[in-house]
């Protein structure tokens, strides 16, 4: 019998809290990971936890990181993710973009210094639910694939 969404989300949150992630960040990250699993994006849901744990244990991410705005204008912002997982900074960035777009008609917000941010569709859905057009993208984790008809890897996958 499949677990309920709330049990699924709560289990992920418990793991993140056990790692030392602040409560609000753990709840938000668990929501995004659970959303991915619920929407069939299994590659970006709870299956990511072992990889995130390796990053944490190898001190490649800060589990207690908090996003901060480094620079902003009425239509843009640059967010620093503090070296942590990317879910919370990405959600924060989209919420910032939505607020700015409501006032100015459009906005662009970038995030730097963060790790994997999960399923991109979660963030674009935030904009759609706000009645806006939204776009989210990420950088690639290195050269991994060959371009169409190419023989050598030259591109990242994101």
Where are these regions (language model features)?
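N-terminal amphipathic/basic leader segments beginning at the initiator methionine
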Residues: 1, 32-35
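Generic N-terminal amphipathic, Lys/Arg-enriched alpha-helix
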Residues: 1-19
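Helix N-cap / loop-to-helix initiation motif
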Residues: 21-26
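N-terminal amphipathic, basic helical "cap/leader" segment at the start of enzyme domains
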Residues: 35-49
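Active-site cofactor/substrate anionic-group-binding motifs, chiefly glycine-
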Residues: 45-98
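Conserved catalytic cysteine-centered active-site region
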Residues: 96-109
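Glycine-rich anion/phosphate-binding loop at the beta-strand->alpha-helix junction
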Residues: 106-158
């Amino acid at each position: 019998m499949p677990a309920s969404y709330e049990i699924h989300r709560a289990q992920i949150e418990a793991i993140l809290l056990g790692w030392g992630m602040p409560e609000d960040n753990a709840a938000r990250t668990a929501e995004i990971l659970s959303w991915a699993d619920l929407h069939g994006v299994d590659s970006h849901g709870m299956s990511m936890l072992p990889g995130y744990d390796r990053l944490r244990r190898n001190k490649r991410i800060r589990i207690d990181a908090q996003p901060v705005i480094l620079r902003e204008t009425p239509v843009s912002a640059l967010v620093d993710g503090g070296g942590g997982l990317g879910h919370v900074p990405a959600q924060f960035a989209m919420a910032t973009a939505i607020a700015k777009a409501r006032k100015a008609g459009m906005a662009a917000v970038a995030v730097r210094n963060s790790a994997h941010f999960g399923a991109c569709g979660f963030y674009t859905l935030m904009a759609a639910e706000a009645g806006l057009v939204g776009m989210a993208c990420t950088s690639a984790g290195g050269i991994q694939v060959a371009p169409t008809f190419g023989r050598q890897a030259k591109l990242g996958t994101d």
